[in-house]
């Protein structure tokens, strides 16, 4: 999927005009304090989680790493 500026999203990602500034990352605890601000860009699809390398994988694979 492409964003408004022609940005190409990777596998398991979707472009969102107003996504979280603090996405969940596999192997890291959730952010304790995250400001409620809109960030546009590529975000993991529902049921996926960001890896520490930057890609998105199914959440069920996160616990296997």
From Swiss-Prot:
Pfam families: TIL. Disulfide bonds join 9-42, 18-38, 22-34, 26-62, 44-56. Its main location: secreted. Residues 9-62 form the TIL domain. The modification Pyrrolidone carboxylic acid is found at residue 1. The keyword Membrane does not apply. Gene3D superfamilies: Laminin. GO terms for molecular function: serine-type endopeptidase inhibitor activity. The keyword Secreted applies. InterPro entries: Ser_inhib-like_sf, SerProtInhib-TIL_Domain, TIL_dom. It is found in: Secreted. Keywords: Antibiotic, Antimicrobial, Disulfide bond, Protease inhibitor, Pyrrolidone carboxylic acid, Secreted, Serine protease inhibitor. GO terms for biological process: defense response to bacterium. SUPFAM superfamilies: Serine protease inhibitors (SSF57567). The record marks 36-37 as: Reactive bond. Belongs to the serine protease inhibitor-like (TIL domain-containing) family. Inhibits chymotrypsin and elastase. Has antibacterial activity against Gram-positive bacterium M.luteus and the Gram-negative bacterium E.coli. This is Chymotrypsin-elastase inhibitor ixodidin. It comes from Rhipicephalus microplus (Cattle tick). The lineage of its organism: Eukaryota, Metazoa, Ecdysozoa, Arthropoda, Chelicerata.
